[in-house]
């Protein structure tokens, strides 16, 4: 199963980018042995000056166009479900075992994800009830994906 993070906005050369690249490459290196690989992070951006719901709907279109066709979608949203790292790892392992080819994680921009996109997702996950900057959410998600593959492969990175 291939996993991909797809986000609104461009991450310039910054400490967050360094961390993100590091976790994605660790995720790919550890995940391949257990049937999970990482696609490059994809970023989308609307250049026109749209506002509010019009902007969110356009960003939703761009996100859906950027992910692999037929990918299962997990949306990142503070109104989503909070779970432990072990439960998240189990969720990823179950999807892999079910034969899912591609799994896309979608992160919104400053306005958040369009409600229709959240409804389309097979799961909506939250890193707590607080709102985090989308640049940090990418890094947090990449780390949790790396942690998940270490849990699934019995690697000692995660200590419960
Ligand atoms: C700055 S936030 C947007 C907040 C926006 N006001 C909203 O209501 O969704 C940008 C993106 O980061 C992600 N995000 C922020 N906080 C999060 C959290 N606690 N859990 C999961 N994702 C989060 C979501 O994908 C969100 O669309």
From Swiss-Prot:
Which Gene Ontology terms cover its molecular function? rRNA (pseudouridine-N3-)-methyltransferase activity
SUPFAM superfamilies tied to this protein: alpha/beta knot
Any idea where this protein resides? Cytoplasm
Q: Where does S-adenosyl-L-methionine bind?
A: 76, 108, 127-132
GO CC field? cytoplasm
Could you tell me the superkingdom of the organism this chain comes from?
Bacteria
State its Enzyme Commission number(s): 2.1.1.177
Catalytic activity entry: pseudouridine(1915) in 23S rRNA + S-adenosyl-L-methionine = N(3)-methylpseudouridine(1915) in 23S rRNA + S-adenosyl-L-homocysteine + H(+)
Question: Has the keyword Lyase been applied to this entry?
Answer: no
The enzyme's first-digit EC class, named in words, is transferase
Q: According to its UniProt record, where is this protein mainly located?
A: cytoplasm
Q: Which PANTHER family does the annotation name?
A: METHYLTRANSFERASE (PTHR33603), RIBOSOMAL RNA LARGE SUBUNIT METHYLTRANSFERASE H (PTHR33603:SF1)
The record describes the protein's role as: Specifically methylates the pseudouridine at position 1915 (m3Psi1915) in 23S rRNA.
Query: Which family does the record claim for this protein?
Result: Belongs to the RNA methyltransferase RlmH family.
**Protein known as:** Ribosomal RNA large subunit methyltransferase H
Q: Which gene encodes it?
A: rlmH
């Amino acid at each position: 199963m291939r996993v991909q993070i797809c986000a609104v906005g461009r991450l310039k050369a910054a400490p967050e980018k360094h961390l993100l690249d590091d976790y994605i490459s660790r995720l790919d290196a550890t995940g391949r042995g257990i049937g999970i690989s990482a696609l490059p992070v994809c970023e989308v951006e609307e250049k026109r000056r749209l506002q509010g719901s019009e902007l969110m709907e356009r960003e939703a279109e761009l996100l859906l166009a950027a992910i692999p066709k037929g990918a299962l979608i997990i949306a990142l949203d503070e109104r989503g479900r909070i779970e432990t790292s072990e439960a998240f790892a189990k969720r990823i392992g179950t999807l892999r075992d079910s034969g899912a080819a591609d799994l896309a994680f979608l992160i919104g921009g400053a306005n958040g994800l369009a409600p229709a996109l959240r409804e389309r997702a097979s799961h909506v996950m939250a890193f707590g009830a607080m709102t985090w900057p989308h640049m940090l959410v990418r890094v947090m998600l990449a780390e949790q994906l790396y942690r998940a593959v270490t849990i699934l492969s019995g690697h000692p990175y995660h200590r419960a």
